[in-house]
């Protein structure tokens, strides 16, 4: 658990290895990060339990990809250990729909490699939970936001009168401010907020206070729920629909765990509530264009590595395609990057398998951080002597060593957790008295001569500088995405590519230990286009990249360059920008974790990667399911006349495979019939 310190974790692992502990809880991410012997030593595994197994096919396909990789990892583990252990998967909310696109049960069985298996099906109905679902009214002259604030505040007053309540709000950002607009100051002491970024001590205190009745209401994101066992919650209120209907059923199921209590799931619904759902969906979304770029990059790396069937691909190789905000905490940024890239590669693997059969491309479940490079510029002899068993000098490069990171950690820094080891390694604080930093080996292929590359970049940066300067002084820094069209057309780049280039160049940088951004963007009203706002200082940054290109990019077309630099340095970003301009290809080894990729059919990979029109069916299906979820909530919340019994029947119909059209036919009719009788 993340609540334990590194020392506490190591003590737990020791107790498991020594046979003092027989039941051991850990996350899929932790299981996939280490050799199994690190946890259990020489002991045999008797049983693996996958609790909340619906997360395998929900979280696993979106934001915690190691859940999806769990099954193949367990299968590989059985092969490596030479014996079989049973796997027991449990969930209260999985959709049974073997012929539909939203099946979760058989998808989970497939993902976890459970077949053949015994399948036990219970009921989703909770007879002691009723519903209070109304249509939110917006009064004359009132905005949606004001109406929502008034409605939730009235609910809060009711909930404070003798109830224990969870209020679910979709966004962590601003949740504390919202809380204060919903609750009178005199009642603030009865209410607490709960979301993922609160520290573990705060979370524990909030849960304990809620359990003991010192807090009557928790305003929470979906982070509150799993693993929290409080039996006397009697109200669950949703400010807006959950991310999925399955999430909604999970969340209302936290009410009335004590069967002697009557719980109520409440919502005041308005059509504009779907804004929250859509914003959450788009926040971490991967586009078809990005998937196409990542697939193309896999093909380019395959060629650069001599068409090797098995390759390690650094997360940095794909950084240009996803454009995540840079963070001061490099490990957090790396973790975000890992989730997005592994998810994208998983979707590509699934799609190619679906289209062509077999496994044209196979992604390894584990992210490796076994070997890498460290640069120590002072030439400290004592440092070299102390760690020579784990470090080999790189020939021809002064002060750079190839390092067996895992062996170094296990033998010299095992008192630290692996995450803390990586943090200090990244920050140059691992080796006492020595400034030794992690660097990545950047292997660069010039697709044009260095002179042509530098000229092309300089010309583009000058055109951008002219646009940004005019915008800054003539239009309060604002310009539209269409303004980029004519500039980037000369470099064979369309508007989406132009947006990616300029935001990578100017957005979310870390300078002198702080996050800075020279550009922001927002959607134009009633248009699916962006309006950008640029701030002062961009010209110095453009000049810096132009000079860096002239200094470091040398040689003829087809030449190779080798750089050892930190993963998120200016040179690394320059190479990403040049890659977007299609004037270099490059790969990174070491510095950041890598993903193993095995190519079983290079012809299929080439065909799809170079087609220029790749469309990923997994993403298409995800989008279809998302739209169906909106329709599902619209039907469930919009029909305010449904009785509690009918709502639970609706839920059971959905979980046992009735499709959206069937639900519409059955429950629209139910409402109409009831209205007719009235």
Predicted feature descriptions by range:
Residues 4-47, 57-61:
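Conserved helix/coil segment N-terminal to the catalytic DExD/H
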Residues 24-26, 47-50, 86-91, 217-220:
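Structural recognition of the conserved hydrophobic beta-strand(s) that form the central parallel beta-sheet
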Residues 28, 52, 171:
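Walker B catalytic acidic pair
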Residues 31-32, 55-62, 96-97, 227, ...:
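Catalytic P-loop NTPase motifs of RecA-like helicase/translocase cores
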Residues 41-42, 46-47, 54-121:
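Post-DEXD/H (motif II) to motif III coupling segment of the RecA-like Helicase ATP-binding lobe
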Residues 126-142:
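Inter-lobe coupling/hinge segments of SF2-like helicase ATPases
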Residues 141, 155-224, 228-678:
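C-terminal helicase lobe
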